Amino acid sequence: QKFLTEYKNHNFYDFQGSTWAPTVVHKEIWKNVNGFSEEFFPGSGSDPDFNMKLWKRGIRIFKGINNFKVYHFGSVVLRDKINKFNKGNKFGSISGKMFLLKWGISIKFFKKFYLLSDIKYEKPLEDPKFSFLFLYKLFLCKVHYLYLKVFYSKLISKSK
């Protein structure tokens, strides 16, 4: 009820790099990338994975629209299952590891350097610009990737 009375007061701007549902895509694009991947636990890593599949197919418009308001319940429906799924995982979420193993970069890296998340939307995205910070963070992703390949063999078989 509170949301319905106050949502008009929450104005920002159309922003770049949306990685959250709801997502609107043409059904042919959805079919082309096979929608959300089932290997990701619902509500945990499936949105960035879907966006990476779109990126790999050449999609470059990832836009959060200010006038489109959605109340997100914060995984209320699946919270217990998600907490159980990630329980005892002090080195990050399992779905974060699965994303890294599948794509070779972390979700955080993808959002920061590819989707440019949370900045004002101005135009379709371009390929990331190489900088020292980009290369350094990419190197850290690759080190973490190798670590997971060596020490998380069960997780690797799960992500395939």
Residue map of PLM features:
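A recurrent flexible, glycine/aromatic-enriched loop bordering the glycosyltransferase active site
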Residues: 4-28, 32, 84-87
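Soluble or luminal CAZymes and related metallo-dependent hydrolases
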Residues: 46, 87-91, 95
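A short, conserved alpha-helix in the catalytic core of glycosyltransferases
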Residues: 17-34, 40-68
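Non-transmembrane alpha-helical segments in soluble domains
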Residues: 51-52, 96-100
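Non-catalytic, C-terminal membrane-associated alpha-helical segments of glycosyltransferases
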Residues: 88-91, 101, 109-160
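Active-site donor/metal-binding and catalytic loop motifs
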Residues: 41, 63-86, 98
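Conserved donor NDP-sugar-binding/catalytic core segment of glycosyltransferases
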Residues: 1-6, 40
